[in-house]
Amino acid sequence: MRPVFEWNLGARSLLLGKRTLIMGVLNVTPDSFSDGGIHFHPDDAVEFALHMLQEGADIIDVGGESTRPGATVLGTAAAGAEAGQEHAAAKTPVSESEELQRVLPVIRALKQKRPECVISVDTYRSNVARAAIEAGAEIVNDISGFRWDPQMKKTIAELRCGAVLMHMRGRPEEWRSLPPVTDMFMLVKRELREWADAATVAGIKRDRIVLDPGFGFGKNFEQNYPLLQRFQEFHELRYPLLAGVSRKSFIGRALARNGKDAPVSGRLLGTVAAEAALVLKGAQIIRTHEVRACRDAARVADIAVM
C-alpha cells in the first residue's frame, strides 16, 4: 500500500498516493538534452504545455536552464549528467535575468489560458523562485536541494508554496572526480533526511516538501539502479516521493547495442519500464517527458499498488 499525503501548495493542496501524479517537463531552453530547444519560444512552450495537459499531465514543470551534460550551472561546466555525452562542450552560464525572461512569460500565459493548471518552476535561484510563484507557479523544484542559493529555504518558507527537494551528489564540475561510494542508496537517503531537516528548521512546513533522489545527478550507471531497486525504502523518511528517470543515460546504457548506448530518441520503452517500476515501488509523482506513455503505464501500475 502506497503512503498517502496531502501536499500543501498554499492556496490549495494535491492528494498524493491515491493515484500517481504526472509532472510534464517543459524546457524553455535552447540546449536541452531531451528536446533540442524546440520549445524555446514562449508561444511554442505554452502550446506544448497545453498538449501535455491534454495528454494527462497533472503538473507542468517549467525550466529555464539546462542541466544536460556540457551545460553550465552556477558558472561551472556539467559533465556526464543526463544524456551521457561525456565530452560535450561547456556552455555559457544562464544569467538570472535571462532565466526570468525565459520562464515568466510562459508561466503567465499558461496560467491565463488554464487558470486551474498546477505549475512548478525548475530553478535553484531564490529570486527566480519568488518571481515565478508571484506569476502563478505553486511549486519550486530545486535540483540543488535548497543548498546553492543561501536564500532559497527562507524564500520558500515565506512564499508558503510547495517544494521539491532533489538530491544531487556534489556539484556538476566535480562529477568526474567524485570518490567511490560503497552504498549509494544509503548516502542519498541520509543526505535527503539531513537536507529536509534543514529545510524544516528554516521554516518550510513538512507538508509542503516532496523528496526526489535525483536519478542521474552525480550518480553513474551502477549507482542509479540501486536507487530504483530500493526506492520503496525512501518512504522511511516519511515524505512523499517524486522520481525523474525520463530518457536518462543509465537507461540508454541498459539498452546499449553493439557497445553503443541507446540515443535519447531510443529510450522511450526503457523510460516507461523504469517509470512503471517506480510506481510499483511507491513513487507518488513521476516527472517525465513522455506524458501519455507514462500516464498509461501509471494507470495500470496504480491498480497493483492500491
Task: Please give the residue ranges for each predicted region.
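SAM-dependent methyltransferases
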Residues: 1-19
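Active-site-adjacent loop and "lid" segments of alpha/beta metabolic enzymes
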Residues: 2, 9-10, 34-51, 67-80, ...
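N-terminal glycine-rich anion-binding loops that anchor highly charged ligand groups
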Residues: 16-25, 51-64
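Conserved, well-structured ligand/cofactor-binding cores
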Residues: 22, 27, 32, 61, ...
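Hydrophobic "anchor" residues on beta-strands that sit immediately upstream
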Residues: 23, 57, 118, 138, ...
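Phosphate/pyrophosphate-binding loops at sites that engage ATP/ADP/AMP, CoA/4′-phosphopantetheine
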Residues: 54, 58, 195-208
